[in-house]
Amino acid sequence: YGLFVCLLLWGGSELCCPQPLWFWQGGTRQPAPSVTPVVVECLEARLVVTVSRDLFGTGKLIQEADLSLGPEGCEPQASTDAVVRFEVGLHECGNSVQVTDDSLVYSSFLLHDPRPAGNLSILRTNRAEVPIECRYPRQGNVSSRAILPTWVPFWTTVLSEERLVFSLRLMEENWSREKMSPTFHLGDTAHLQAEVRTGSHPPLLLFVDRCVATPTRDQSGSPYHTIVDLHGCLVDGLSDGASKFKAPRPKPDVLQFMVAVFHFANDSRHTVYITCHLRVIPAQQAPDRLNKACSFNQSSSSWAPVEGSADICECCGNGDCDLIAGSPMNQNHAARSSLRSRRHVTEEADVTVGPLIFLGKAGDPAGTEGLASAAQATLVLGLRMATIVFLAVAAVVLGLTRGRHAASHPRSASQ
């Protein structure tokens, strides 16, 4: 009798008995079927709730019209004789979202609000509210799409894209290490290595877009000599076959090239600075007329790329490589000034190596004079810098001495 009253009041067995109810069927004692009444699926951007029509496990099936989802009371999308199904967006039906230290929590509820059937004024099931919650990690990937193998979260990848470090270095003849001495004789070949440090960035392919040589660090100064132009054409190779790109590359983010040593006529400084505009593209992108590394072969009078099809170098001969502007790029002062005026973005940068000191031919007295002149200029610059540093240190020491002297001999109020 007590169990019967409890069932009428609460409409369920779990509140009335500490153990599951057992019933008799066909003369044998069997446990009630253990069917999960509510199944929740938390998808990438949607919420799926499947409700058993035997919601209370009593054998009394609920009506589809008595079920709703969320504060806005969304109706079911599908139903069968056994289940009722909801499928909504995470932000729909008035669902709430909460941000914790490590999760995004979407909360909603399933409401069963029975109505009297027909003209009857009685209910055989109770009103019930089932809380629903979906948790998503804030530092993970919840997409069903494949993850690109950067192996870092998206925000880290974005930061690493802003930290590309471009460099241009003078190397030994065997490319094994950086050349420590900046001196050359006429007839030598300078070995230059352009490189970009990519960090956690996806693989990149580096190109030397343009290079210009000047006697000072001012890349727009005069006189000047163009080494690379037209988006990767090593035009210095037209006058000396030793000037060319090295193929194949050691790595996609490294590009090496040789330049036959020269000096500027009627210039007593015997120094040269080389400024190059470097740029990168995704490694999977094929080289084209705007992204290439082409050398001139004097024996065959033709241009050849380090990689890519041969036709991308054809424009080096006729000068129409600049597809964006729609016109050939002239080797003039304006073209060299664009090295400095172009916007510095993460995919490109200007880098300078120098000064390279040229001594003339080996054993040439004129070369010794040039070395003495260059060394004298370097010595004068060093002495000036040392004098400035000495004066600055002396001023700081003098100020500290005066401060300590004043602190150790304070004046009285009467004085």
Curated annotation (Swiss-Prot):
Positions of glycan attachment: T28, N119, N141, T150, T156, T157, N174, N266, N297
Subunit details: Polymers of ZP2 and ZP3 organized into long filaments cross-linked by ZP1 homodimers. Interacts with ZP1 and ZP2.
Residues on Extracellular side: 19-378
Cytoplasmic membrane side: 400-415
Topology class, membrane: Single-pass type I membrane protein
Transmembrane segments: 379-399
Record remark on domains: The ZP domain is involved in the polymerization of the ZP proteins to form the zona pellucida.
Name used for this protein in its record: Zona pellucida sperm-binding protein 3
Cystine crosslinks: C42-C134, C74-C93, C211-C276, C233-C294
A Pfam short name: Zona_pellucida
GO molecular function: acrosin binding; carbohydrate binding; receptor ligand activity; structural constituent of egg coat
Keywords: Cell membrane, Cleavage on pair of basic residues, Disulfide bond, Extracellular matrix, Fertilization, Glycoprotein, Membrane, Pyrrolidone carboxylic acid, Receptor, Secreted, Signal, Transmembrane, Transmembrane helix
Pyrrolidone carboxylic acid, modified sites: Q19
